[in-house]
Amino acid sequence: MSKLGILLTICLLLFPLTAVPLDGDQPADRPAERMQDDISSEHHPFFDPVKRCCRLSCGLGCHPCCG
């Protein structure tokens, strides 16, 4: 049993669990990239670049809104 423990210890030292990518493609793991991937107001289909606000209501996810 002690040989198994020694083998396990050596394996964990050589290949730590932090080196294994678990869910690297999840946006929650990369908040900076998630913020860049969000649709900004300027790229929203209802955004009016002349008025710098949305043409329709704010409930559609476009900010800043025309009051």
Curated annotation (Swiss-Prot):
Post-translational modification: Has been found to be hydroxylated and amidated by Han et al. (2006), and to be unmodified by Ju et al. (2022).
Signal peptide bounds: 1-19
Keyword Signal among UniProt keywords: yes
Sites bearing Cysteine amide, chain numbering: 66
GO cellular component terms, semicolon-separated: extracellular region
Superkingdom, natural source: Eukaryota
UniProt note on tissues of expression: Expressed by the venom duct.
Main location: secreted
Domain notes: The cysteine framework is III (CC-C-C-CC).
Family: Belongs to the conotoxin M superfamily.
Note: Negative results: does not show inhibition on Nav1.4 and Nav1.8 sodium channels. Intracranial injection into mice does not elicit symptoms.
Name of this chain's protein: Conotoxin mr3d
